[in-house]
Amino acid sequence: MGLLDITDLIVFYENAIAINNINMSFNKGRIIGIFGANSAGKSTLMYTISGIILDVKKKEEMKGGERITIMGNILYDGQDITSLEPSERARRGIVLCPERRRIFIESSVMENLRIGGILATKRQAKETLDYIFSLFPTLIKLRNRPGGFLSGGEQQMLAIGRALMAQPEVLLLDEPLLGLSPAMEDVVTDAIEDINKDRGITIVLSLIHI
């Protein structure tokens, strides 16, 4: 049994199957890559592990939209979290950095980071903030700039930093290299390796290419 175990997971939208009977086990402290083409179900898997798929399902049901069916089980550290809300999963240490980054474009870099650390203690927030700035020194000079005025690469650094402020034990990175220049891909890739090595965080990332 790993830190995170997925058993017989099936997710389908109306008649389209997004995830078909997946069984996976992620060991603690590892970097796990999930590779696939567009529309292969990578984002759906990330949303399902983080629990955000449950919010999407509720919204679709409320507006009479697309029906989403989820079957199977997800165990985290031996506990069944299949029905837990995403906020509770985040409190337990499962944090998603989504493909579209979803930073607050009118808020500054510092404000975005503080929002990410809302559940952290003051000591945790300060230590993590110092670590983020050592990981991404560029964010220091950009700390007062609104998120909407950052480049794609700068937004990705901020999104990863904000996720770290939430004190994850499992960090889900959905397409962290999407739309980045080769140079910025190297920066982000190096940062992912450093985060895993320095903080022992289990990292699951989805990628279209290697």
Regions found by a protein language model. Name each.
Residues 4-6, 18-19:
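Conserved structural motif at the start of ABC-family nucleotide-binding domains
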Residues 208-210:
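Conserved small/polar residues in nucleotide/adenosyl-binding loops
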Residues 186-200:
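Helical segment within the ABC ATPase nucleotide-binding domain
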Residues 14, 53-61, 107-127, 135-137:
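ABC-type ATPase nucleotide-binding domains, specifically the catalytic core motifs of the NBD
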Residues 165-169:
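A short, proline-enriched helix->beta-strand linker immediately N-terminal to the Walker B motif
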Residues 59-88:
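ABC ATPase NBD Q-loop/coupling interface
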Residues 35-37:
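The feature captures the beta-strand-to-loop junction immediately N-terminal to the Walker
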Residues 107, 149-150, 163-164:
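ABC ATPase signature
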